[in-house]
């Protein structure tokens, strides 16, 4: 029997955590092939839970440092839009003229593509391996906005060489079993003089302790990731590509600027309970099932086990 001094909220909280852990341990999403990645994103898209909580940007946000003496935090969804604008600025895509062509590799349901087309005048082609994501991206895109979407494998792009003025890819690399092939395809379709903008979840260099190895295994097996590259490793893959043409790749670490996203993604369920409850009991269980992985991601990025790498470069003419 539980001690009578235990408050009901504590008992309920412990029960919810136990349920979340049970679902998490029994329902892994190990990477098996490109089809397993497509299936995972098809499920995440059709159940609408991720979209209800994260909006139409299925990536982390960029949080500006508050002004001195102020502690107000950025809104989760506003931070996601800010991420797009910050990566555009950092990679100098804002120097390209309206009408420039841009390929979004791993476009999700098209949130970034729509900003890039609407706010910068790019002609965007977005690709994803998930048919459900592409269907949803098309349905969310207003008529007249210069965005096209297609189901395509990032490791075998069905696109001509040197066909885009810019190539953009955010948080897609973790799902790629062949990082060199991924780098090669990004640069193959980039025109001479074109700009590259990539963001990636990276593991740190160096050996890991036993606990860190356990965490890393969970981060791989829960969300269909075959392996994480290091920042230096992906930089090397890009620079040594036969399509790089002596291209210099610059990098930065945005771990701190993106870190609040993980806890905010859980907090969205508290801020918008109707978003989950309106989808029914299955969505509630699904939300619980994702929570341990999100918490481990936060821990990994907070401690430096994981890093949020960004990569930019201009392909020589």
Regions found by a protein language model. Name each.
Residues 2-53:
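N-terminal auxiliary segments of SAM/dcSAM-dependent transferases
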Residues 64, 77-98:
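Conserved alpha-helix/loop element of class I SAM-dependent methyltransferases that forms part
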Residues 101-103, 109-156:
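Class I SAM-dependent methyltransferase SAM/SAH-binding core
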Residues 155-166:
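A short acidic, Gly/Pro-enriched loop at the edge of an enzyme's catalytic core
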Residues 166-178:
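A short SAM/SAH-binding and catalytic strip from SAM-dependent methyltransferases
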Residues 180-195:
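A short glycine-rich, Lys/Arg-flanked "PGG" loop and its adjoining helix->strand segment in the class I
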Residues 198-200:
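Acidic carboxylate diad motif detector
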Residues 209-305:
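Substrate-binding/catalytic lobe of Class I Rossmann-like enzymes that use SAM or dcSAM, i.e.
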